[in-house]
Every structure is written in structure tokens, then in C-alpha cells.
Amino acid sequence: MKPISLRIYGTGLIGTSIGLRAAELSWPLSLIDSSIGSLRIAKDLIPSNQDIESPELIVIATTPDSALALVSEIAESYPESTVIDVGSTKTKVQLEVESIPDFSKRFLGSHPIAGRERGGPHSARSDLFAGRAWVLTPSQVIEPWRLKLVSDFVSAMGAVPYQMSTKLHDALFAKISHLPQLISVALASSISELGTEISLAGQGLRDMLRLAGSDGALWSQILLDNKDEVLSSVDDFQELLDVLRDAIENDDEHRIREMFDDAGLVPEKIGGKHGMKRREYTFVDVVIDDKPGQLASLFNECGSIKVNVEDLALEHSPQQETGLIRLALSSSDADLLYQHLLKRGWKAHKQ
């Protein structure tokens, strides 16, 4: 596709990652940020930054409060540009856009489903959006050519565009993003008084607390922006927690097991790699000796018969003389690799 000239407001994780990818594509771009420190880092990372008077596409990648304040300024200063935001909530900013005559024709809400545990330009990556979903929330009056421009932009970032209404977006992400964040924070708070004995916690607790260290200033804005949907999700969750509590109090083993069984089906609904539709894999387990070059040799075997390894996991303890590599492949590739490894003398097992 032809280059798109960009002006990016906000040089945090998302804005700088967009800039890095645009620089890879040799697109003209300029960066704006009220934080001198963040802007300096972003400009060091993206030396191709330049001044663009009339950008084709403006990206608002600031905090929610700053984004709302920028909308009217950008609408007036850049009357021809297509404008998108990349925030986690959509309804509030869309209402602000609709208050400006004709701006809805060239504004498109968007939300890249990508991130890292730590924000800021120093965490930015040019491949942050590769294979990720990127939600678009076009209004009924958006000009079609602008919608195509943004869709092409998203694809160029390496992401996959999905369309939905602002209302559906905010209701959905209250459940699948905002509620998990609240649960993690509440769980962390509930055990904050524990002493050194907390180090005995297993991986389950560590996994659930991963979100607890998120940026409180940013998340307070997100939660308040989406207040009604978040409260509705919290109420629904509280009802289910009460049901589970009652079942425990009443020694209702059947109800407890029923809830666990129902819950166990949910992970299968979640997409596989990069949030895309889950693929069915066949697993090949390979036991290897703990000596140099074993993993490289195994990958050479895969390459020699041109099979595609979709994912892998390594199980090995420091004092263990052997390790186990689990390879995820398509059914046909798994059959081919399994037979090949057996013939080559590897200790292979197919699941």
C-alpha cells in the first residue's frame, strides 16, 4: 500500500509502537507529547520524525482524559485529516466527537488489543500489533474512503481489523478486560497484609496477580469512563461469587462441581495465538538429554522435513538429566514429524 502520513499524539507504549512500525514502512510521521521525557525517548527511537502540516491520518494515543481534551482542538486545526483514537473505552469520546459538526464523518474510534506489562516508550515494539485484533467502531456517517484508509492502516501495522458498535465494545470490554483488572487488584489488596509466607504462593496466584501492577492513574480514567458497564459487570460477578459462597456454606458439592465444570469450558472460547480463532493442534513430546545442542538439533530435524511448529513448551529442572520439549503442530505435520523423529532415533511421543 502507499505510505500514509501520520501525526501521533502521545508517545506511550501504543503511540511509540505505531511510530516504530510506521518508520519501518518509511511513512512520514510526526510525534507530539506534553511529556518532554517521553517525547525525547520516542524521538531517539524514531529518528525519522518530521513536521507534517496536513497529515492524512492523526492518531490520538494519549490517556482518556487528554484524548477528550484534544478532540475539539484537532477537529479545528486539521479540517481535512482522518482522525482515530486508540483508547480502551469508546462511548464517551464518540459523544464528544458527535458534539462537533461534521467531525463524525472523519473520526473513527479504534482499540488495538495489544499491550505489555509495562507501558511507556521504552517498552514500545514495532511488532507489538503483529497478528493482534484491532477493533474499529465506525459511526453511521463515517465516509467510506476514510474507513478504508484506517482499515489499511491497521493491516499495515500487522493487526487484524474487527468492527463493532461503541456500545457493544464498551459492554464487551467491561467484562473481558476491565473486570479482570478489578479482580486482580482486589485479590492483591485482600492478601496485602501477609508477610514473608506469601512467597509460598504457587503459579496460580502469580498468574492472577499479574494485572495488579498496572498503572493506577490510567486505569482510574478507564474505569470511570466506562462506569455504567463496569458496575454492571461487577454486579454480575458478585452474584456468581455469592452463589459459590452459598454452595460452600451449604456443603453443596454438586453445585460447586457444576460451576467448575461450566467454568472449565470457557477457556476454549478464547482465541488462540494473538487473539485469533483457536486452532486445533496435535502435540509431539520429545525427551532430550541435558547437553548442549539438543534443542538446535531438534529444530534442524523440523526444518529438514519442512514442518511448521506453531508453539512449544520446555519442561526441565536444573538437576534433571533429561528435559521434555512439547511441540504444537497441525495434525498432518505432527504425524510427519513423529514418524521422522522415531526413524532418526529420537524419543518422541504423540499426544
What residue ranges belong to the model's regions?
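Rossmann-like NAD(P)(H) cofactor-binding subdomain of soluble oxidoreductases
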Residues: 70-121
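N-terminal Rossmann-like NAD(P) cofactor-binding module of classical short-chain dehydrogenase/reductase
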Residues: 58-59, 84
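A conserved regulatory-domain signal marking ACT and ACT-like small-molecule sensing domains
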Residues: 266-351
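Short beta->alpha hinge that forms the Motif I/post-I loop of the SAM-binding pocket
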Residues: 34, 62, 86-88
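Internal alpha-helical scaffold of NAD(P)-dependent oxidoreductase catalytic cores
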Residues: 128-213
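NAD(P)+-binding Rossmann beta1-loop-alpha1 motif at the extreme N-terminus of oxidoreductases
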Residues: 1-51
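Conserved hydrophobic helix-helix packing surfaces used for dimerization/oligomerization
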Residues: 6-8, 58, 134
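Interdomain hinge/lid region at the active-site interface
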Residues: 194-264, 282-284, 291
